[in-house]
């Protein structure tokens, strides 16, 4: 019975990519810098001491970090008995965004340039926002700038609730984000507004429209909820998910995976919010999974709650929680199963700003007859998709080199 389980630690990079200089990210290292902060006693909020990831270390995380950066992360060493195949991958895609990373790991790199709203203020063309407002029956909007999601709620959340005007904002990624209060504006109204924006953004080649619902009564308690929804464009070619689905297999999405692939190649989707729920649902779906099945989970909190917010201690605590659940995963695996731990980009919580970092990602693979040891540096995330295609004996992808015979 052939089954593949992809646990995608959103933003968990393992050192600056070969082309990091093009992005201003030379020296970034999400894993290494978190480990160093922990070792230095600078990440003791809610946790204490060195970064403890014994199970990921057994899958080869420390060794992957060493091969990527030339040194072991603080607290990790060569004295661990590694049970998995480990490597690290550079990104071929033009951007360091979520869709690019996900699509590339499924065998379809983004080799064109996304559209961006690069102006920090007055970010959106008036022609665009006028069309969105007219179609939605709204008389105005707030924001129109680059901002972090938490910051803009503190600044504009109350005005939004008083006026009913949605908050439009963007970032260094190819995104158009809309924040609205779940009660005063309504979640369905927000989703409908995002669908309108998605249609009007087609000429601008923007990767995603993101609905950012929030709750609360004021800046002190405004909080984004788990009802986020991403409206992505379709990948430019069939991914390995599409190929397995077309071959009669099952592709189970947990978390925001389905949104990122614009629901293409997905046969079942399950919503879950927070690391605990996401891991619980992953285990539940693995127990249910039959032959020719992919279960694919995005653990978004690493990125959204800790990476972008530059919360090093929070990121470390979340990693340690994730690691603590891995024995439960190992206990339910079957001999032919293939498990892959990876990431879609970096988001170094010690780095300047609030954006993603251009980093290599870990490629930790276990099962399916793979020998423990190094997979080396992979030239593209697409090696993951190609390996999955090889594992399921699907038609090869156009990009990537399989590490599975």
Swiss-Prot record:
Protein biosynthesis keyword on record: no
Annotated GO biological process: 2-deoxyribose 1-phosphate catabolic process; 5-phosphoribose 1-diphosphate biosynthetic process; metabolic compound salvage; nucleotide metabolic process
Functional pathway: Carbohydrate degradation; 2-deoxy-D-ribose 1-phosphate degradation; D-glyceraldehyde 3-phosphate and acetaldehyde from 2-deoxy-alpha-D-ribose 1-phosphate: step 1/2
Leader sequence residues: none
InterPro entries reported for this sequence: Alkaline_phosphatase_core_sf, DeoB, Metalloenzyme, Phosphopentomutase_DeoB_cap_sf
The reaction(s) this protein catalyses: 2-deoxy-alpha-D-ribose 1-phosphate = 2-deoxy-D-ribose 5-phosphate; alpha-D-ribose 1-phosphate = D-ribose 5-phosphate
Gene Ontology molecular functions: magnesium ion binding; manganese ion binding; phosphopentomutase activity
Annotated binding of Mn(2+) 1, by residue: 10, 344-345
Sequence positions that bind Mn(2+) 2: 303, 308, 356
The protein's required cofactors: Mn(2+)
Role played: Isomerase that catalyzes the conversion of deoxy-ribose 1-phosphate (dRib-1-P) and ribose 1-phosphate (Rib-1-P) to deoxy-ribose 5-phosphate (dRib-5-P) and ribose 5-phosphate (Rib-5-P), respectively.
Family under the similarity heading: Belongs to the phosphopentomutase family.
Protein name (Swiss-Prot/TrEMBL): Phosphopentomutase
């Amino acid at each position: 019975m052939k089954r593949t389980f992809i646990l995608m630690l959103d933003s968990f990079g393992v050192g600056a990519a070969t082309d990091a200089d093009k992005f201003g990210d030379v020296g970034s290292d999400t894993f290494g810098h978190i480990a160093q902060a922990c070792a230095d006693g600078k990440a003791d909020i809610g946790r204490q001491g060195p970064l403890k990831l014994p199970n990921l270390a057994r899958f080869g995380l420390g060794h992957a970090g060493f091969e990527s950066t030339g040194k072991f992360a603080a607290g990790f060493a060569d004295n661990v008995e590694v049970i998995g195949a480990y490597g690290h991958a550079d990104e071929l895609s033009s951007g360091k965004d979520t869709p690019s990373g996900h699509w590339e790991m499924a065998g379809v790199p983004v080799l064109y340039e996304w559209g961006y709203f690069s102006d920090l203020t007055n970010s959106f063309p008036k022609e665009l926002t006028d069309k969105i407002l007219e179609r939605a029956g709204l008389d105005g909007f707030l924001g129109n700038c680059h901002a972090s999601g938490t910051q803009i709620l503190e600044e504009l959340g109350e005005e939004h609730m008083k006026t009913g005007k949605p908050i439009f904002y963007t970032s260094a990624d190819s995104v158009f984000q809309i924040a609205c209060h779940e009660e005063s504006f309504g979640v369905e109204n927000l989703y409908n507004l995002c669908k309108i924006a998605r249609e009007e953004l087609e000429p601008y080649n923007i990767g995603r429209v993101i609905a950012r619902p929030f709750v609360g009564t004021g800046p002190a308690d405004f909080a984004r909820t788990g009802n986020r929804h991403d409206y992505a464009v379709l990948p430019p070619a069939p991914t390995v998910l599409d190929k397995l689905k077309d071959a009669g297999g099952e592709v189970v999405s947990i978390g925001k995976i389905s949104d990122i692939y614009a629901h293409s190649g997905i046969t079942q989707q399950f919503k879950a919010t927070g690391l605990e729920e996401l891991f619980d649902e992953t285990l539940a779906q693995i127990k249910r999974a039959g032959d020719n099945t992919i279960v694919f989970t995005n653990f978004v909190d690493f990125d959204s709650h800790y990476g972008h917010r530059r919360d090093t201690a929070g990121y470390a605590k979340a990693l340690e929680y994730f690691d603590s659940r891995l024995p439960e995963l190992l206990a339910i695996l079957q001999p032919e199963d293939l498990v892959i731990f990876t990431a879609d980009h970096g988001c170094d919580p010690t780095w300047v700003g609030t954006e993603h970092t251009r980093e290599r990602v870990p490629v930790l693979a276990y099962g399916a007859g793979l020998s423990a040891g190094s997979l080396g540096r992979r030239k593209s995330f697409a090696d993951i998709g190609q390996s999955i295609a090889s594992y399921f004996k699907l038609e090869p992808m156009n990009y990537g080199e399989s590490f599975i015979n």
